[in-house]
Regions:
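N-terminal secretory/targeting leader peptides
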Residues: 1-43, 51-196
Length: 196
């Protein structure tokens, strides 16, 4: 697991998204995607000008980590479904791969959610282990072939109007960098967010 490996210093850095650490730190879900929450512009305004960055760094420092926001994904699709969805009733009993706080919403309406890694989604659809999935933006989902099995796609994603991805750096390694090196990492990631 990236979180523990970077935190312990087994590796210097890793790439992920904060929502995967919700079991360890529930508050970090607000640094990845919030159902019915802010779009990318609003999230970035809070992150840069509303204290979000400092709060994120404070939370992670307790775990010997330094986060750097490196990617912002615009709205994802609400999912790819084998069967057409016409009402909330159609979600009851649906087996679906779902991420983060959105999974809690889907569970409340009667779906049965599970979190699968990206590479496990297509085989799970193919085998019928899941009936539907959400994962990323439609362009990424299409590259992964979800449409070949789950023909019905709904957009935009209410559960992830914007998604932040992070570069996790071991805090001891981060602190050992020069101010110039830190600025280079921050600038590179900022450029990635802006130009995606």
């Amino acid at each position: 697991e990236i979180f523990d490996a970077v935190s312990s210093g087994a590796v210097d850095a890793g790439w992920s998204t904060a929502g995967y650490w919700a079991g360890k730190i529930p508050a970090v879900q607000f640094f990845t995607a919030i159902p019915f929450g802010p779009n990318a512009t609003e999230f970035l305004a809070w992150y840069h000008e509303g204290g979000g960055k400092e709060l994120w760094e404070e939370i992670y420092a307790r775990h010997n980590l330094h986060p750097v926001q490196c990617v912002m994904i615009s709205p994802e699709s609400s999912g790819w479904f084998r069967e057409e969805i016409n009402s909330v009733e159609d979600l009851k009993g649906l087996k679906m791969r779902f991420f983060g706080l959105g999974a809690k919403v889907m569970d409340k309406v009667g779906a049965s959610t599970q979190l699968l890694a990206g590479g496990d989604i297509y085989p799970a659809l193919e085998l019928g282990t899941i009936d539907a999935t959400e994962f990323a933006m439609p362009s990424i989902d299409i590259d992964l072939g979800f449409y070949q099995i789950a023909k019905h796609n709904y957009f935009p994603g209410w559960h992830q109007p914007a998604s932040a991805l992070e570069l996790l750096i071991n805090l001891d390694k981060w602190n050992a960098l020069s101010e110039t090196q830190k600025a280079q990492v921050e600038a590179t990631c900022s450029e990635s967010v802006v130009k995606g």
